[in-house]
C-alpha cells in the first residue's frame, strides 16, 4: 500500500539544510548581493529541494523594509548566480541546484486565519 504523504529523502533534507545555512551566511555578510538587499532584512523560512536535486525552492520573509515583494524578488534573482556559485563551493556535488526564490505566504495566511477566528 502506498503512502499518501510525500516524504523527502535524506539527501534532499541534507542539501536543503546546507543551502539554507549558505543563504543565511550570504544574507548576513551582504557580499555578492544586489545593493537593494543591504538594508532589507530577510528570513529564509524553508528550502525545499526537488527529488532529482536539480531545483531548490527557497522561501523568504522580509522584515521592516521599504521594498516591495517584487523588488526583493528582482534583487534576489539578480544575485542568483553569485548565490549559486557560493552554494556550489559549500556542497560537493557534480551539479549545483537551480535556486528559485518564493515569497512565503504562510505568515500572511496565519494572520488571515487569526482574524477570521477572532471574528467568530
Curated annotation (Swiss-Prot):
HAMAP family: RbfA. Keywords: Cytoplasm, Ribosome biogenesis. PROSITE patterns: RBFA (PS01319). Monomer. Binds 30S ribosomal subunits, but not 50S ribosomal subunits or 70S ribosomes. One of several proteins that assist in the late maturation steps of the functional core of the 30S ribosomal subunit. Associates with free 30S ribosomal subunits (but not with 30S subunits that are part of 70S ribosomes or polysomes). Required for efficient processing of 16S rRNA. May interact with the 5'-terminal helix region of 16S rRNA. GO terms for cellular component: cytosol. It comes from the Bacteria. This is Ribosome-binding factor A. InterPro entries: KH_dom-like_a/b (IPR015946), RbfA (IPR000238), RbfA_dom_sf (IPR023799), Ribosome-bd_factorA_CS (IPR020053). Belongs to the RbfA family.
Amino acid at each position: 500500500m502506498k503512502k499518501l504523504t510525500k516524504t523527502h529523502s535524506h539527501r534532499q533534507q541534507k542539501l536543503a539544510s546546507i543551502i539554507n545555512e549558505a543563504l543565511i551566511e550570504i544574507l548576513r555578510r551582504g557580499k555578492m548581493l544586489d545593493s537593494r538587499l543591504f538594508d532589507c532584512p530577510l528570513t529564509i523560512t524553508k528550502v525545499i529541494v526537488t527529488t532529482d536535486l536539480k531545483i531548490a525552492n527557497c522561501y523568504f520573509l522580509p522584515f521592516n523594509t521599504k521594498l516591495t515583494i517584487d523588488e526583493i524578488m528582482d534583487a534576489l534573482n539578480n544575485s542568483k548566480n553569485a548565490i549559486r556559485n557560493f552554494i556550489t563551493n559549500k556542497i560537493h556535488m557534480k551539479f549545483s541546484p537551480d535556486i528559485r526564490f518564493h515569497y512565503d505566504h504562510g505568515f500572511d495566511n496565519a494572520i488571515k486565519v487569526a482574524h477570521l477566528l477572532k471574528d467568530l
